[in-house]
Amino acid sequence: MIPAIENAAFTPPNAAASVIKPYVMSHGTLEVYNLKASRRFYEEFLGFECVRHAIPAMVIRCGLKFHIVWVEGGDQLKPVNLLNHWGVDVGSRAEVDRCWKSANEQKEKYGIRKVLPIADQHGVYSFYLVDLDHNWWEVQSYEGFQHDDMFDFGDRFSMDEGAVSAEVSGIKAGEK
């Protein structure tokens, strides 16, 4: 099930006391080798809306009030770690299964470098893939609307907890 986004208007709870007074986190940036090849992947495989707004760059979006700017870096592109990933929510566990199967079947067509196994982890049912530009994507299903739930639940761990779990250490080392 795809959750309804009830109120997209938002006022950050600590904006009055902050130096910067944001009303929205508007965008992020990722690098691509080639705009044309990457656009095909983002539109045809991930289903995002793409617009070329500048000669070396494009923007993509899918829901909410947030977009990603992608910049053609060519040979200067630096691959990122799995922890530096972008999340894509789908409506059900069955849809995650279908997407995982499609990702494996269409690796060559879209230049997908790697598709990791599906797992139940950190409260979601998901898998990760690495695209043609070394960007990591997590395709996940979550019962509810994770964006709201994470903030509604509030802090679940103290900032004084210093130990990094073996799971996170393994992900950082690329052992996932």
Range-by-range predicted roles:
Residues 2-36, 86, 145-176:
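N-terminal beta-strand motif that seeds the catalytic metal site of vicinal oxygen chelate
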Residues 2-14, 49-84, 90, 136-141:
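Conserved short beta-strand elements that form part of the metal-binding/catalytic scaffold
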Residues 18-19, 75-77, 117:
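Short, flexible, glycine/charge-rich loop motifs used to bind or transfer phosphoryl groups or to couple energy/partner
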Residues 19-23, 29-72:
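Core segments of cupin and vicinal oxygen chelate
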Residues 21-24, 79-83, 120-121:
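Short glycine-enriched loop/turn motifs at secondary-structure junctions
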Residues 32-36, 87-136, 144, 164-176:
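Vicinal oxygen chelate
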Residues 79-81, 109, 148-151:
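A short, polar/proline- and glycine-enriched secondary-structure boundary/capping micro-motif
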